[in-house]
Amino acid sequence: MKVKVIPVLEDNYMYLVIEERTREAVAVDVAVPKRLLEIVGRERVSLTTVLTTHHHWDHARGNAELARLLPGLVVLGADERICALTRRLAHGEELRFGAIHVRCLLTPGHTLGHMSYFLWEEECPDPPAVFSGTGCPVPTCPTSPCPIPLSLTHPTPQGMHCPWPAAAHAWRAQFSRCTRAWWRPWAPCPLRQ
């Protein structure tokens, strides 16, 4: 599994996840479809599916144009407000793209229909990936080398609106303690089971 991180807008990202054996690709949070298609062409992959974390424009505005340019493209997400949605996903649902497994995790907080995606390949030495959209208030979370307990990265809606900067320091301290204690490279990943 190869993940291409694509910076877009001023402070956002899209992702292209490539199944290296079949050259099938899945995009996550399409905001700028032309930029994504440039990379799809450069990587020589077949883009078949879009996973959308939530309906906000900076994560979903490119879905309609991409679906128009790629007939048959499947657009997935948990919220019916997502542009060009083909099928709604349920919490705990699992998908497969070649050797890549996807576990869909409803993570409301930023929006009610926010969904995160946990991706992994069996018998692959590469670490799994979590795509949390805007559900992760901890700046280091998306690039963490390990799966992170969702209770830390997806607080309640009330917790998302806590005062700063004191709350930010508390979250960082809690995240740091938990990550050091929780992650062990030799331990099985609880989200894969």
UniProtKB/Swiss-Prot annotation:
Keyword terms, alphabetized: Hydrolase, Metal-binding, Zinc
Disulfide bonds: none
A Pfam match: Lactamase_B
Ligase in keyword set: no
SMART domains reported for this sequence: Lactamase_B
Binding positions (Zn(2+) 1): H54, H56, H110
The keyword Hydrolase appears for this protein: yes
Function: Hydrolase acting on ester bonds.
Provenance organism: Bos taurus
Top enzyme category: hydrolase
Binding-site list for Zn(2+) 2: D58, H59
Gene3D superfamilies tied to this protein: Ribonuclease Z/Hydroxyacylglutathione hydrolase-like
Enzyme Commission numbers on file: 3.1.2.-
GO-annotated molecular function: hydroxyacylglutathione hydrolase activity; metal ion binding
Cofactor dependency: Zn(2+)
InterPro entries xrefs: Clx_II_MBL, Metallo-B-lactamas, RibonucZ/Hydroxyglut_hydro
Top-level taxon: Eukaryota
Record's cofactor remark: Binds 2 Zn(2+) ions per subunit.
Family affiliation: Belongs to the metallo-beta-lactamase superfamily. Glyoxalase II family.
Protein's UniProt name: Hydroxyacylglutathione hydrolase-like protein
Transmembrane domains' residue ranges: none
